[in-house]
């Protein structure tokens, strides 16, 4: 894509990577479903949680774009979607300003949530912002040392699902824990396919992801097991009489198995970007099925 004017609206939209907002929406959606079934759902804090999640996702996208560019990780042989700074669509100076804006807006949204969740939400919000930077920035970028999967489990599982529920219910229970775990595992499939696709370039750049450390075959197996484990987590909901929350998510395994087989056939190269799209679709299917299962 060459017809992108530097620092234009189009450039910022591309840098924001709106397709990644699915991963931000699913945990909040599940937290809202849990609040609904326990009789605590409130529209205003729910909308604020969605807004905070979207702003933090865009913030993280900007941060990763800038610091991967500064570290030289976005090489010419990059297989994934084009990055704004590396392509010259957005200058490093402008991206820093963009990061400041999204961080500020997320902070303001977080302050609004304090009215519902209480002061205990302050350290959670601060942690979200700090780890958004530490993922690719700083002297020990966590994504470069194999911590990405754990961070996804925490910040796309327990934090957004649990805190969305908490700001409405001021409570935490085992249903929240299991939904958070399932959500974190399912969203980690997206990181796993990213790392599987980029394994050769990551090894050259010194990015020691789990796939780089354990190898491509292990990455393929882990990709499948993450989805399977997420479905297993749903069996907990039998304890609260939510049979549909057990059965409906199992339908996710059909596209997940097909995508895993497709991934194994392609194995390397830019064609794996198609698997990225399939994984995002499957992830949304799981989130919608579990949400529906909880509400029914």
Q: What are the language-model segments listed below?
A:
Residues 239-296:
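Extended hydrophobic alpha-helices typical of membrane-associated regions
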Residues 83-171:
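Intramembrane alpha-helical segments
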Residues 76-116, 210-241, 280-286:
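Multi-pass membrane catalytic core of lipid/isoprenoid biosynthesis enzymes
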Residues 1-44, 48, 140:
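Topogenic membrane-insertion module of multi-pass membrane proteins
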Residues 55-79, 189-211:
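Acidic (Asp/Glu-rich) catalytic motifs at the cytosolic membrane interface
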Residues 29, 38-66, 122-130, 174-193:
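Membrane-embedded alpha-helical segments that form the functional core of polytopic membrane enzymes
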Residues 152-199, 217-220:
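Functional transmembrane core segments of multi-pass inner-membrane proteins
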Residues 26-31, 150-165, 183, 211-216, ...:
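Small-residue-rich segments of transmembrane alpha-helices in multi-pass membrane proteins
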């Amino acid at each position: 894509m060459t017809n992108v004017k530097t620092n234009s609206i189009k450039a910022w939209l591309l840098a924001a990577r709106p397709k990644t907002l699915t991963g931000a929406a699913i945990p909040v959606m599940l937290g809202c479903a849990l609040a609904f079934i326990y009789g605590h759902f409130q529209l205003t804090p729910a909308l604020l949680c969605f807004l905070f999640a979207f702003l933090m996702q865009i913030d993280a996208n900007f941060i990763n774009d800038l610091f991967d560019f500064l570290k030289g990780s976005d090489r010419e042989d990059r297989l994934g979607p084009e990055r704004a700074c590396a392509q010259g669509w957005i200058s490093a100076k402008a991206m820093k300003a963009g990061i400041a804006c999204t961080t500020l807006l997320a902070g303001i949204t977080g302050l609004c949530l304090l009215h519902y969740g209480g002061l205990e939400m302050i350290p959670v919000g601060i942690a979200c912002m700090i780890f958004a930077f530490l993922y690719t920035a700083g002297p020990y970028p966590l994504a470069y040392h194999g911590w990405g999967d754990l961070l996804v489990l925490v910040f796309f599982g327990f934090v957004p699902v649990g805190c969305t529920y908490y700001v409405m219910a001021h409570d935490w229970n085992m249903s929240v824990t299991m939904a958070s775990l399932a959500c974190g595992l399912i969203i980690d499939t997206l990181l796993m396919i990213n790392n599987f696709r980029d394994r050769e370039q990551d090894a050259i750049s010194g990015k020691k992801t789990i796939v780089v450390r354990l190898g491509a075959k292990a990455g393929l197996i882990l990709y499948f097991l993450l989805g399977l484990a997420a479905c297993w987590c749903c069996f907990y909901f039998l304890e609260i009489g939510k049979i549909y929350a057990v059965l409906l998510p199992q339908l996710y395994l059909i596209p997940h198995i097909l995508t895993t087989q497709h991934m194994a056939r392609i194995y390397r190269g830019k064609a794996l970007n198609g698997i990225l799209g399939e994984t995002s679709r499957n992830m949304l299917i799981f989130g919608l099925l579990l949400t529906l299962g909880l509400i029914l």
